[in-house]
């Protein structure tokens, strides 16, 4: 096998692992995510100029699924509509201080139309 084929297989496996982590206990969404991943890989199965970009995209998708997707489950019998979040060990956690200071160092210049 060629190097792109091996790395494409690795990217596909990363997506499968990430979907298992992100959609644990949600079989319907897990199967839909895996079907979509399979469909996307089948659409782009020929090696071409954009193959490395497609592989990189797949790896980024796997990372987002693994580190940034949190599912919520509505608690049964609760009229106030309380939700429980399924936060796993791989979820990226930020603190409020980083949010408060985000973008403060950015200088805004003249508008494009000026």
Swiss-Prot record:
One annotated GO biological process:
mitochondrial respiratory chain complex III assembly
The GO molecular function terms of this record are: protein folding chaperone
Q: Where in the cell is it found?
A: Mitochondrion matrix
Query: Keyword set for this entry?
Result: Chaperone, Mitochondrion, Transit peptide
Q: Where is the signal peptide?
A: none
Describe the family membership recorded for this protein in Swiss-Prot or TrEMBL.
Belongs to the complex I LYR family. MZM1 subfamily.
The molecule here is called Mitochondrial zinc maintenance protein 1, mitochondrial
> Lineage from the top down?
Eukaryota, Fungi, Dikarya, Ascomycota, Pezizomycotina
Give the gene name.
Answer: MZM1
């Amino acid at each position: 096998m060629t190097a792109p084929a091996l790395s494409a297989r690795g990217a596909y496996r990363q997506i499968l692992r990430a979907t298992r982590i992100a959609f644990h206990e949600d079989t319907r969404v897990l199967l839909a995510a895996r079907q979509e991943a399979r469909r996307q890989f089948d659409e782009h199965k020929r090696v071409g100029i954009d193959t490395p970009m497609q592989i990189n995209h797949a790896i980024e998708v796997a990372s987002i699924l693994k580190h940034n997707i949190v599912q919520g489950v509505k608690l049964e019998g609760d009229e106030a509509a309380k939700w429980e979040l399924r936060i796993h060990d791989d979820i990226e956690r930020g603190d409020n201080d980083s949010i408060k200071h985000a973008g403060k160092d950015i200088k805004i210049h003249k508008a494009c139309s000026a």
